[in-house]
Swiss-Prot record:
GO terms for cellular component: cytosol. Its EC number is 1.11.1.21. Formation of the three residue Trp-Tyr-Met cross-link is important for the catalase, but not the peroxidase activity of the enzyme. Coiled coil: none annotated. The active site is at H109 (proton acceptor). One of its GO terms (biological process) is cellular response to hydrogen peroxide. It holds the Pfam family peroxidase. This is Catalase-peroxidase. Residues 1-38 are annotated as: Disordered. GO terms for molecular function: catalase activity; heme binding; metal ion binding.
Length: 740
């Protein structure tokens, strides 16, 4: 056998990229990513419902990262990190003798992939270690930053995740350069595989921008202007050095990361108080990114042939800018230079558009030669902070009030690096700030004693006698709980925010119907609480309990009595502690579990169902059994008959699967856009059922059909009920971190 493995891989890559892998070359081996997708690229990718399987975790299922992290001496860890920051290594020399600015960029870019629309991205799992993020153009040379930290990671092992280490190092860098941070929370457990469930954009080449339509309208859920960038192009839109146009891009991308105008200015100015950019030579001198680099480079990429390829010869963005005269010390130098000089356009040694101060003295130190000085320079996006009519006054105020600027940056940095961690109750370590912030979706303390099992039984009876139907109780509980997103741990039933704006007005929640149900539930709550002494039931608990009681009733009617596990202890959030604007991002534009499809969706309903199931952390069997159960319980949007493949709605039977797979039914599209279908009796032609793409996919997709066959079998009635209950309880408790 040949030992020239790299040649084999290269040949396979070449043949694959020549065109069609079947007609003009060899299909890739499964170990190279080959498989069914190359033949049927439009097929559902159910693998996103099997993320991070236990078998892939080398630490084992019993490993408790929270417990391991709490055993750390965090102060000792920080001392070790601080030593790394000022110990320059010959293989990658530190700018100004300090790796702090590099580490700030590393932490920023780890967290900065977060976007509000689906909660994906962010620093929470240390994904910067894996493709595609480890090889994004905007993450150039951050592979060196992580490699510099290996001695620290090696020393503390599994007590300190990479995900926590990246963020903590950013904090230590700021602190050792004279900045007082807002705090730090640990708790980000590592994963062991690259995320395959994040849509980063439609482009197939780096730095392309096919994500825009109309008047520069950025596609949802994306949070960056070009493929492979964290936010914006620092040269301006598509390299056009227009600070005003760049400000528009900045505002939109930072908004999609949950930052307002003040936070945006503080973050950019605070980050650019430190360090420099790198563009010492032409881009074509830079080699392959880490994923494409040769094996002997051992995961390091962007090897440069310009000069020494490092230090003063380093190339990253192609820009060559140092913002302040004290690039390793916190201060107000960024704003001072921004406002005190006028700037003219120039090209960096790499040919990138940047700005240099006109008629300015050479006051900026060189990163590697103490004998050299430079004039102040700025990026196009830096000038946006001065010239934009909204950013400009904010920047001026921060310049004139440095303490206000420092506080704004500290808070914005903390938000940036902790936004995807979920509620404050998940924060770990001695540096967790005492102050509770509204973006953490805070919940109040319980108003009374928690209800017990006897109270639960009493309330179930009252709920079932309240006049609300099984469909109404189930739909309301689902609407409340299914807002949860495993991506950033937001949403869920705890807090009963379904009764607050904006959720009570969402189209998917049928506002008029919801208002009627909530009035009845609030009546049950008042009656119970007025006569229960110290014990109080929250509306949040009552909503979930109502759904669970309805499921029990439906299961009994199907002939399989079951008790749905219920854990009391939820509380009701207040408007004061609910950022209504931030919750607008959680509004579903589609929910296949309720057969709801809003307007403007790019993907067909079955793909949107899969995406929703992924956010709910469901497996493919859980998604399947929930859809089948919710259909027969009548939980469709606006009482739609789509997918109600049963003659006994309200009874928890497996009829959805039995009738979908009935060989005596033929299906035909009933809409031009092929979103709805009718099923007719093959013998008589009589219309029997109506369904959506989110229904028929369980018969058309081979893998989902295999699951549907399990539940359609003659012996599956009881299993179906028990599996539905288990999946139902999982969704109801997704945000009950206190139960873990």
């Amino acid at each position: 056998m040949s030992e020239n493995h790299d040649a084999i891989v290269t040949d396979a890559k070449t043949e694959e990229t020549d065109g069609c892998p079947v007609a003009h070359g060899r299909a890739p081996h499964p170990t190279q990513g080959g498989g069914n997708r190359q033949w049927w690229p439009e097929r559902l990718n159910l693998k996103i419902l099997a993320k991070n399987p236990a078998v892939a975790n080398p630490l084992g299922e019993e490993f408790d990262y929270a417990e391991a992290f709490e055993a750390l001496d965090l102060a000792a860890v920080k001392r070790d990190i601080a030593e790394v920051l000022t110990t320059s290594q010959d293989w990658w020399p530190a700018d100004f003798g300090n790796y702090g600015p590099l580490m700030i960029r590393m932490a920023w870019h780890s967290a900065g992939t977060y976007r509000i629309s689906d909660g994906r991205g962010g620093a929470g799992a240390g994904q910067q270690r894996f493709a595609p993020l480890n090889s994004w153009p905007d993450n150039g040379n951050l592979d060196k930053a992580r490699r510099l930290l290996w001695p620290v990671k090696k020393k503390y092992g599994q007590n300190l995740s990479w995900a926590d280490l990246l963020v903590l190092t950013g904090n230590v860098a700021l602190e050792t350069m004279g900045f007082e941070t807002f705090g730090f929370a640990g708790g980000r457990a590592d994963v062991w595989e690259a995320e395959e469930d994040v849509y980063w954009g439609p482009e197939t080449t780096w730095l392309d921008d096919r994500r825009y339509t109309g008047d520069r309208e950025l596609e949802n859920p994306l949070g960056a202007v070009q493929m492979g960038l964290i936010y914006v192009n620092p040269e301006g839109p598509n390299g056009n050095p227009d600070p005003i146009a760049a400000a528009r891009d900045i505002r939109e991308t930072f908004r999609r990361m949950a930052m307002n105008d003040e936070e945006t200015v503080a973050l950019i100015a605070g980050g650019h108080t430190f360090g420099k950019t790198h563009g010492a030579g032409p881009a074509d001198a830079v080699g392959d990114d880490p994923e494409a680099a040769a094996m002997e480079q051992q995961g390091l990429g962007w090897k440069s042939t310009h000069g020494t390829g490092k230090g003063g010869d380093a190339i990253t963005s192609g820009l060559e800018v140092t913002w302040t005269s004290t690039p390793t010390q916190w201060g107000n130098g960024f704003f001072k230079n921004l406002f005190e000089f006028e700037y003219e356009l120039e090209q960096s040694p790499a040919g990138a558009n940047q700005w240099v101060a006109k008629d300015a003295p050479e006051i900026i130190p060189d990163a590697h030669d103490p004998a050299k000085k430079h004039r102040p320079r700025m990026l196009t996006t830096d000038l946006s902070l001065r010239l934009d009519p909204i950013y400009g006054p904010i920047s001026r105020r921060f310049y004139e009030n440095p303490e206000e600027f420092a506080d704004a940056f500290a808070r914005a940095w903390f938000k940036l690096t902790h936004r995807d961690m979920g509620p404050k109750s998940l924060y770990l370590g001695p540096e967790v700030p005492e102050e509770t912030l509204i973006w953490q979706d805070p919940l109040p303390e319980p108003e009374g004693e928690v209800i017990d099992a006897e109270d639960v039984a009493t309330l179930k009876t009252k709920l079932l006698e309240s006049g609300l139907s099984v469909s109404q109780l189930v739909t309301t509980a689902w609407a409340s709980a299914s807002t949860f997103r495993g991506s950033d741990k937001r949403g869920g039933a705890n807090g009963a925010r379904i009764r607050l704006e904006p959720q009570r007005g969402w189209e998917v929640n049928e506002p008029d119907e919801l208002a009627q149900v909530l009035r009845v539930l609030e009546g049950v709550q008042r009656e119970f609480n007025s006569g229960s002494g110290a014990k109080k039931v929250s509306l949040a608990d009552l909503i979930v309990l109502g759904g669970s009681a309805a499921v029990e009733k439906a299961a009994k009617e199907a002939g399989f009595p079951v008790e749905v596990p219920f854990a009391a202890g939820r509380v009701d959030a207040t408007e004061e502690h609910t950022d209504a604007e931030s919750f607008e991002a959680l509004e579903p534009t589609a929910d296949g579990f309720r057969n709801y499809l809003g307007k403007g969706n790019r993907l067909p309903a079955e793909f949107l169902l899969l995406d929703r199931a992924n956010l709910l952390t469901l497996s493919a069997p859980e998604m399947t059994v929930l859809v089948g159960g919710l259909r027969v319980l009548g939980a469709g949007h606006q009482q739609s008959q789509l997918g109600v493949f049963t003659r006994t709605p309200g009874s928890l039977t497996n009829d959805f699967f039995v009738n979908l797979l009935d060989l005596g039914t033929t299906w035909k599209s009933t809409s031009e856009d092929r979103t709805t279908f009718e099923g007719r009796d093959a013998a008589t032609g009589e219309v029997k059922w109506a369904g959506s793409r989110a229904d028929l996919v369980f018969g058309s997709n081979a893998e989902l059909r295999a699951l549907a066959e399990v539940y359609a079998s003659d012996d599956a009635g009881e299993k179906f009920v028990h599996d539905f209950v288990a999946a139902w309880v999982k969704v109801m408790n997704l945000d009950r971190f206190d139960l873990a």
